[in-house]
A protein has these predicted regions:
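STAS-like cytosolic regulatory interaction modules
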Residues: 1-49, 59-103
Length: 103
């Protein structure tokens, strides 16, 4: 996971967002909320996501909203797009999902 130092921070999550890593990711993700009015989460390097990872993203959204901050999901990987489509969650997060063809 990598956080940039831009005006609006971008938090890049790499690797798996599964039950095996959500404990590790939760603290970093929740700590990043509130460092700026908007937090962007870059999901381009997420290789696998399960319901625990989805729940973490939902929690982050709820925490950001409760504190009056914006949370944006960006650059959804194929694994994230597949999970969002399966669970019909694209509308829940409200972020545009751009599907990039595999090279």
């Amino acid at each position: 996971m990598d956080a940039s130092d831009d005006k609006d921070p971008v938090l890049r999550i790499e690797g798996e967002m599964t039950i095996y890593r959500v404990g590790e990711l939760k603290g970093t993700l929740l700590a990043a909320i509130g460092k700026s009015s908007t937090l962007e989460i870059d999901l381009s390097a997420v290789t696998e996501i399960d319901t625990a990872g989805i729940q973490l993203l939902m929690l982050a959204r709820k925490v950001a909203e409760a504190k009056g901050y914006a949370l944006r999901l960006a650059a959804h990987s194929a694994a994230v797009v597949e999970a969002f489509e399966l669970l019909n969650l694209a509308g829940y997060f409200g972020d545009p999902i751009v599907i990039v063809p595999a090279a």
